[in-house]
Curated annotation (Swiss-Prot):
Top-rank taxon, per record: Eukaryota
Originating gene: Zfp60
Protein's name according to its UniProt entry: Zinc finger protein 60
UniProt-recorded Gene Ontology molecular function terms: DNA binding; zinc ion binding
Protein keywords: DNA-binding, Metal-binding, Nucleus, Repeat, Zinc, Zinc-finger
Origin species: Mus musculus (Mouse)
BP-aspect Gene Ontology terms: regulation of DNA-templated transcription
Length: 707
C-alpha cells in the first residue's frame, strides 16, 4: 500500500508538457507523412496514459486539441521560453496542485524531497525533517482558488484556438523555394540556408561550418576544456546540462518508457524522443538516405555520422598519440585507453567500466534476461538483433543480394566482402595497378608506393617513410617512451594495440567467434581476415605468376619468392630466407630442440604444426583432396604442389636464361649453374656439390670404403 501511494505522489508531480515533444513549423515540415502519423499516435497515447492515472476526464491541452482533428501541432502558441501558455495549462496539472492532491503536508522520502527541490519552481515553502522522511509545509499565502485559476473550459479553448489560427496568418515573409511563411525576416533568412546549403558560421579551431550561430556555439564547447556541469555521484563533467542529465540516468538505472513491440525501455521523460525514434525501427522507416552510397537510416544523426566516412574530415585529435577521429564521442572513448578512467561501477559485482554503455550492457549479465525467443527451436536471446541473425539459420533466406552479379548472401558482411570484386563504391582507381579506393586520402597514400617517394625522414637514424604516421610510430622506438603498461605483469609497450594483444596472453580469452565454423579469435582483425575464407574471395593477385590470395600480407610474402631478396640470414650456416618466420623455424635445426612429442608413437618434432601434420598419419586423415584425380594429401602445401601437374604451372622462372620450373628446389639447383656456387661440401674429401642429394650419394662411397 505504501508503495502504491509513493508511486501516486511521483505521478502527481508530472505534467503533460514535461513529456510532450514540441516541433517548430520548420521542423514539422521536415517530417514525412508516416512520421507525422507516428508522432500523433505517441502524443495521444501519452495523454491517454495520464488520464488513466487520474481516473477521470480532464481538460485537454492545446496540443491534443490540435492533434485529434489532425491539425498542425506547431499552431499551439508558445511564449518565448518555448513553453505552452499559462492559460492552456492542463486540468491534470492544476488538479494536482490543489491541497488535496499535492505533496504539501505529506510524508515523503528524503530522496524524493531532494529531487522535487531541483525540479519544482514553488517558492515560499518550508521543509521539516523526521526520521527517514521529510514534510513540505504549505506556504502561508497559498489558496485553493489559485490552483483552479488556470483551468480552461471548452468554450475558452475554442476562442483561443481561433485566435491562434488568425495569429498564424500574419506571416508576411514567404520562402520562394517551398512556399513556407515566416513572421520574422531573420527566420526566413535562416530557413533559406537549408535550400542554398550555405553555412556561413565557421569554427576557427577545426574549420567546420554551420548554418546557425547557435550550432556553432554548441560545437565550440567541444574544443574548450570548460565543463561546468559535474556529476555529483562520479565527478564526471560535461559541456551541456542535457548531457549531464542523460549521464545521471546511468547511475539510477531508471527506464520508465517501454516499447510495446519488443519490450525495450528508455531512460527518462526528457528522452521520450528516443522511444519515438526507436519505434521507427519496427515501422521499417528509414527516411534519411546517403547521397553517396544510397544507404538509408532511421535517424538523421546516424546519417550525419555515416557521411563522415566518405569525407576526409577527422577534426578530433588525441593529444597523447595523435590518432584522429571523425566524431567527438570516438575520441572520448579512445582517451580512456590512456587515462584508464573507469568511473562507472556495477552495484551488483563491483566491476568498473570506462564507458556508461559498457555498464548498461554488463547489467544484462546479472539479470540473465533473454526476452527474445525463437519460435522454431525455442532458443532465447538478449537482443532482437541476435534473434533475427539466428532465425536466418532455419531458412534458406539470403536477403543480401549483389546488384551486379545477383549473388545472394545470408549476412551483410559477406555481401560487403563479395562486392570488393566489383569495386562498388570505390571511385578512385590507381592507373599503375588498377586497385580501387573508397577515399581519396587512401588513394593518394597508395600512389606513393609506385612513385617511391618517402618524404618523411627520421632525424635520429635517417630512415625515411611514405607516411607521417609511420614516422611517428618509428620514432617511439628511439625514445624510451612506452606509455601503455600491463597491470598484470608490468610490461610496457609503445602502442595500445600491442598492449591489447598482450593482455590476451593473461586471460586466454578468444571472444571473437566465427558464426560459420565456430572458430574463435583473440582479435577482431583476425576474425575479419578469417571470414574471407568462407566468402571465397581472393582479391590479391600476383602479377608474376597469377596466383591469388585472400590476404594482402600473404601476397607480399609470396612475391618475395620471385625476387632474389633474402634479407634474413642464419648466423650458423649462412642460409638466407625471405621471411623472418622461416629463419626462426630454421634455427631450431641448429639448437636440436624437439619439444613437441607424439603420444601415439613417441616421435618428437621441432614445431607444433609438424606434430599436427604427423598425427594425421595415425588417424589416416588426408583432408586435402585433388579435384582432378581424387588423390588426397595430409598437407595443403602437398596439394598445391601436386596441382601443378594438372595445370602445368611453372611459377619459378630464371631471370638469367628464362627457363621455368615447377618446384622451388629445381629452380635453386638450376640457378647455381649461373652463379657457380656449390654449397654442399663433403667433410671427407672436400668435394662440393650443387644438390644435397648428390652429396648423400657421394658420401655413400666413403661409407663403403670404410672397414
Amino acid at each position: 500500500m505504501a508503495n502504491s501511494s509513493s508511486q501516486h505522489m511521483v505521478c502527481g508531480s508530472v505534467t503533460f508538457r514535461d513529456v510532450a515533444v514540441d516541433f517548430s513549423q520548420e521542423e514539422w515540415a521536415c517530417l514525412d507523412a508516416t512520421q507525422k502519423v507516428l508522432y500523433r499516435n505517441i502524443m495521444l497515447e501519452t495523454y491517454s496514459n495520464l488520464v488513466a492515472v487520474v481516473g477521470r476526464c480532464i481538460p485537454k491541452p492545446d496540443l491534443i486539441v490540435l492533434l485529434e482533428p489532425e491539425k498542425e501541432p506547431w499552431m499551439a502558441v508558445k511564449k518565448e521560453t518555448g513553453r505552452p501558455s499559462q492559460g492552456l495549462e492542463t486540468g491534470f496539472e492544476a488538479e494536482n496542485r490543489s491541497p488535496k492532491n499535492h505533496v504539501y503536508n505529506k510524508k515523503l522520502p528524503k530522496q524524493t524531497i531532494q529531487q522535487l527541490s531541483k525540479t519544482s519552481d514553488v517558492q515560499g515553502v518550508s521543509v521539516s525533517n523526521g526520521p527517514g522522511y521529510s514534510v513540505i509545509k504549505e506556504p502561508q499565502n497559498y489558496q485553493e482558488g489559485d490552483a483552479n485559476r488556470n483551468i480552461t473550459n471548452k468554450k475558452e479553448m475554442s476562442t483561443y484556438t481561433s485566435k491562434t489560427l488568425a495569429h498564424n496568418k500574419e506571416k508576411p515573409y514567404k520562402c520562394k523555394d517551398c512556399g513556407k511563411c515566416f513572421g520574422c525576416k531573420s527566420n526566413l533568412h535562416q530557413h533559406e540556408s537549408i535550400h542554398t546549403g550555405e553555412k556561413p558560421y565557421e569554427c576557427k579551431d577545426c574549420g567546420k561550418t554551420f548554418r546557425l550561430p547557435q550550432m556553432l556555439s554548441r560545437h565550440q564547447k567541444s574544443h574548450s576544456d570548460e565543463r561546468p556541469f559535474e556529476c555529483n555521484i562520479c565527478g564526471k563533467s560535461f559541456h551541456l546540462p542535457t548531457l549531464l542529465q542523460y549521464h545521471k540516468n546511468i547511475h539510477t538505472g531508471l527506464k520508465p518508457f517501454e516499447c510495446e513491440e519488443c519490450g525495450k525501455s528508455f531512460k527518462s521523460f526528457n528522452r521520450i524522443s528516443t522511444l519515438f525514434q526507436h519505434r521507427t525501427i519496427h515501422a521499417g522507416m528509414k527516411p534519411y538516405k546517403c547521397n553517396v552510397c544510397g544507404k538509408a537510416f532511421n535517424r538523421r544523426s546516424n546519417l550525419l555520422q555515416h557521411q563522415k566516412i566518405h569525407s576526409e574530415d577527422r577534426p578530433f585529435h588525441c593529444k597523447v598519440c595523435g590518432k584522429a577521429f571523425t566524431v567527438l564521442a570516438q575520441l572520448t572513448r579512445h582517451e580512456n585507453i590512456h587515462t584508464e578512467d573507469k568511473s562507472f561501477e556495477c552495484k551488483q559485482c563491483g566491476k568498473i567500466f570506462s564507458n556508461g554503455s559498457y555498464l548498461l550492457r554488463h547489467y544484462d549479465t546479472h539479470t540473465n534476461e533473454k526476452p527474445f525467443e525463437c519460435n522454431i527451436c525455442g532458443k532465447a536471446f538478449r537482443l532482437h538483433l541476435y534473434l533475427s541473425e539466428h532465425q536466418k539459420t532455419h531458412t534458406d533466406e539470403k536477403p543480401f543480394k549483389c546488384k551486379l552479379c545477383e549473388s545472394a548472401f545470408r549476412r551483410k558482411y559477406q555481401l560487403s566482402e563479395h562486392q570488393r570484386i566489383h569495386t562498388d563504391g570505390k571511385p578512385y582507381q590507381c592507373k599503375d595497378c588498377w586497385e580501387f579506393f573508397r577515399r581519396r586520402s587512401n588513394f593518394i597514400e597508395h600512389q606513393s608506393i609506385h612513385t617511391g617517394k618517402k618524404p618523411f625522414e627520421c632525424k635520429d637514424c635517417g630512415k625515411v617513410f611514405r607516411l607521417n604516421i609511420h614516422l611517428i610510430r618509428h620514432q617511439r622506438f628511439h625514445s624510451d617512451e612506452k606509455p601503455f603498461e600491463c597491470k598484470e605483469c608490468g610490461k610496457a609497450f609503445h602502442f595500445s594495440s600491442q598492449l591489447n594483444n598482450h593482455k590476451t596472453s593473461h586471460t586466454g580469452q578468444t571472444p571473437f567467434e566465427c558464426k560459420e565454423c565456430g572458430k574463435s579469435f583473440k582479435r577482431v582483425s583476425s576474425l575479419v581476415e578469417h571470414r574471407i575464407i568462407h566468402s571465397g574471395v581472393k582479391p590479391y593477385k600476383c602479377n608474376a605468376c597469377g596466383r591469388a590470395f585472400n590476404r594482402r600480407s600473404n601476397l607480399m610474402q609470396h612475391e618475395k619468392i620471385h625476387s632474389d631478396e633474402r634479407p634474413f640470414e642464419c648466423k650458423d650456416c649462412g642460409k638466407a630466407f625471405t621471411v623472418l618466420a622461416q629463419l626462426t623455424r630454421h634455427q631450431t635445426i641448429h639448437n636440436g630442440k624437439k619439444s613437441y612429442e607424439c603420444e601415439q608413437c613417441g616421435s618428437a618434432f621441432r614445431l607444433p604444426y609438424q606434430l599436427t601434420q604427423h598425427q594425421r598419419i595415425h588417424y589416416d586423415v588426408k583432408p586435402f583432396q585433388c579435384k582432378e584425380c581424387g588423390r588426397a594429401f595430409v598437407r595443403s602445401t602437398g596439394l598445391r604442389i601436386h596441382e601443378r601437374i594438372h595445370t602445368g604451372e611453372k611459377p619459378f622462372q630464371c631471370k638469367e636464361c628464362g627457363e621455368a620450373f615447377q618446384y622451388h628446389y629445381q629452380f635453386l639447383g638450376h640457378f647455381r649453374i649461373h652463379t657457380g656456387k656449390n654449397p654442399y661440401e663433403c667433410s671427407e674429401c672436400g668435394k662440393y656439390f650443387t644438390y644435397g642429394r648428390d652429396l648423400k650419394v657421394h658420401q655413400s662411397i666413403h661409407n663403403l670404403e670404410k672397414p
